Amino acid sequence: MTYTRYERARIVGARALQISMGAPVLVKTVKIDPLDIALEEFDADRVPITVKRQFGTCSEVL
């Protein structure tokens, strides 16, 4: 999936916040920093967050 840098930052930041609040981690890792874990999940395409883009009158869900 291709995301803009802004979408990527929003997804990783939101997931890092979820992890820091106690959400289960979806990849096996030895890291303890929520941001590093969120980046690993994003790179492994395991982040349970969707992006809704709007193009004119249509919308696309990624």
From Swiss-Prot:
SMART domains per UniProt: RNA_pol_Rpb6
Keyword Electron transport appears in the UniProt entry: no
EC class of the enzyme, as a word: transferase
Enzymatic reactions: RNA(n) + a ribonucleoside 5'-triphosphate = RNA(n+1) + diphosphate
Cellular component annotations (GO), alphabetically ordered: cytoplasm; DNA-directed RNA polymerase complex
GO molecular function, one term: DNA-directed RNA polymerase activity
One biological process term in Gene Ontology: transcription by RNA polymerase I
InterPro entries (alphabetical): DNA-dir_RNA_polK_14-18kDa_CS, Pol_omega/Rpo6/RPB6, RPB6/omega-like_sf, Rpo6/Rpb6
Organism domain of life: Archaea
Compartment(s) where it occurs, according to its Swiss-Prot or TrEMBL record: Cytoplasm
Keywords: Cytoplasm, DNA-directed RNA polymerase, Nucleotidyltransferase, Transcription, Transferase
EC number in record: 2.7.7.6
Protein family: Belongs to the archaeal Rpo6/eukaryotic RPB6 RNA polymerase subunit family.
Subunit structure, as described in the record: Part of the RNA polymerase complex.
Functional summary from the UniProt entry: DNA-dependent RNA polymerase (RNAP) catalyzes the transcription of DNA into RNA using the four ribonucleoside triphosphates as substrates.
NCBIfam families for the chain: PRK01099.1-3 (NF002208)
Record-given protein name: DNA-directed RNA polymerase subunit Rpo6
